[in-house]
Amino acid sequence: MRTPTHDEFSGRLDSLNGDRSNVFGPELGEFSNADRRADELGDKETKTGTTTVGIKTEEGVVLATDMRASMGYMVSSKDVQKVEEIHPTGALTIAGSVSAAQSLISSLRAEVRLYEARRGEDMSMQALSTLVGNFLRSGGFYVVQPILGGVDETGPHIYSIDPAGSILEEEYTVTGSGSQYALGVLEQEFEDGLSIEEAKGVATKAIRSAVERDLASGNGINIAVVTEDGVDIQRHQNFEGLE
């Protein structure tokens, strides 16, 4: 896979770093000011708090998130879309810094288009997960912990990617501040052979469990279904009729 360091698209970010580091060149080193920026912002930065869930089925994948954003102890938004299409058959959930997540999503969309235009072929989910991991390892997207879900010619895939860039392919996974509550539901409810509709019900139950206990999660649910036909994202202000 092409390493995302090409200057035609990526450009140089000398003015941001004071050196030759580049957000699209994770193999060249990390941002020198990433830790300082995090310390300076602290609770002033808008964060998604969040509970996000990913489940793989034989037909595709289901991604679900809550809809609350927080700033310190304040709810800064009750209507945040925390799952976005980044590939014709791939979507990404976000947990962590809102600004970093928005930048990451925009960068991934652009790199996917560039990759496919240059090569004349679809980017595989393995290649896309590597791209996400490389971006996070660069230190330029502090702190984001996404779940990547998608379908390619080898089938459905769910990847858990931590803020340091490590990548784990899973049958199901969770991220965010409410993850311990959601994980308990998944451990109990997940089984091989779930249909898309059954997986949506399990994901909804997991998110609902988290929002009832986690102060940083709440205000509805986003559900994305990814199949070989594309990405369908639906927003619900409450949980009625979803389980």
UniProtKB/Swiss-Prot annotation:
Keywords: Autocatalytic cleavage, Cytoplasm, Hydrolase, Phosphoprotein, Protease, Proteasome, Threonine protease, Zymogen
Biased composition (Basic and acidic residues): 1-11, 33-47
Superkingdom of origin organism: Archaea
PROSITE patterns from the UniProt entry: PROTEASOME_BETA_2
Propeptide: 1-49
Knockout consequences: Strains lacking psmB gene are inviable.
Signal peptide residue numbers: none
Ranges where the record places region Disordered: 1-50
Name this protein carries in UniProt: Proteasome subunit beta
Gene that specifies this protein: psmB
